Every structure is written in C-alpha cells, then in structure tokens.
C-alpha cells in the first residue's frame, strides 16, 4: 500500500484513476467524466454502521455537469445509475485502500430505492458507504450498504452493494 490517508482530494482521486495509488493492476477509480465524486472526506477501516469500515465522499453539483445537458433536454436530472455507480466506485476504492489486489468490478446489489432526484439546483451530493463484510480468497469481495443525500436529505438507499477485485487473468469475461 503506497498511500493510506483518511481523506483524498480531487488530485488524489485522479491519481487513483491513473493507477498510481494502489499499484499497477490494482483498484482504480474511473477518470472524468465517469468519476462521480470530487473528494473522499472520510475513510476508516473500523467505522460505519457495522464497525467494519466507512467511506464518505462528496460531489459539488454544478448546472453544467455533463449529464444535465443530455438527460433530459428541458428536464435535467442526474441518471440514477450514476449515483449507484459512485457507491460501487467507493466500495472498490475501499478494497484497494485496505490492500486488496486486483482490478475492481461491480457485481450487483441486493436492493435499491430512490426517493428523490439530483437536480441542477442541488448544491452538494454526499455519498456514504458502510462496509458489511470483506472476503479475501481467490478474489477480494466487498459487501456494503450505502446512501446518497442531496443537501442533507437521503434520496437513494442501496443494500448489499457487491464489488470484487480480480487478478487480470481472473476477471469476469476473460
């Protein structure tokens, strides 16, 4: 592990996206525009609802974010799948941060509920992931619950987010 801070700014996230944070062939965040947060404000190995880890991140919402111009014309809203992907991105980051080896892949989730939308007038999105379990065998598998809030109101809840880290020769579809 090269870098194990308790928070990461945008430059740190970009370094992760370039593969510079956890070593070659290991967990990477996507680069913009698919990187769905601007900073990780907190990451711990023993915090969160289940005492097994917590990661919290933020996105500063601006009306010119790329998805508002195309989803939908005259009715801009952040696609719900992008908020979900942010939660998966965070689980993968956590697995790399704890020393897991391999490339991250989202593997599914148990349940997802939307009760609001991310609209251009929103100022800040906060993402929270509570780690429930990490299994380390042929692959590293993380299972977590997460939520997304807009300006303090929780509008997405995801249960049993699953992310795996796969060695390059063991990744799904290879």
From Swiss-Prot:
Gene3D superfamilies: Hotdog Thioesterase. GO terms for biological process: unsaturated fatty acid biosynthetic process. Pfam families: FabA. Pathway: Lipid metabolism; fatty acid biosynthesis. GO terms for molecular function: (3R)-hydroxyacyl-[acyl-carrier-protein] dehydratase activity; trans-2-decenoyl-acyl-carrier-protein isomerase activity. It catalyses: a (3R)-hydroxyacyl-[ACP] = a (2E)-enoyl-[ACP] + H2O; (3R)-hydroxydecanoyl-[ACP] = (2E)-decenoyl-[ACP] + H2O; (2E)-decenoyl-[ACP] = (3Z)-decenoyl-[ACP]. Disulfide bonds: none annotated. The active site is at residue 71. It is found in: Cytoplasm. Its main location: cytoplasm. InterPro entries: FabA, FabA_FabZ, HotDog_dom_sf. One of its GO terms (cellular component) is cytoplasm. Keywords: Cytoplasm, Fatty acid biosynthesis, Fatty acid metabolism, Isomerase, Lipid biosynthesis, Lipid metabolism, Lyase. The keyword RNA-binding does not apply. Its EC number is 4.2.1.59, 5.3.3.14. Transmembrane segments: none annotated. Belongs to the thioester dehydratase family. FabA subfamily. Necessary for the introduction of cis unsaturation into fatty acids. Catalyzes the dehydration of (3R)-3-hydroxydecanoyl-ACP to E-(2)-decenoyl-ACP and then its isomerization to Z-(3)-decenoyl-ACP. Can catalyze the dehydratase reaction for beta-hydroxyacyl-ACPs with saturated chain lengths up to 16:0, being most active on intermediate chain length. Homodimer. This is 3-hydroxydecanoyl-[acyl-carrier-protein] dehydratase. The lineage of its organism: Bacteria, Pseudomonadati, Pseudomonadota, Alphaproteobacteria, Hyphomicrobiales. The gene is fabA.
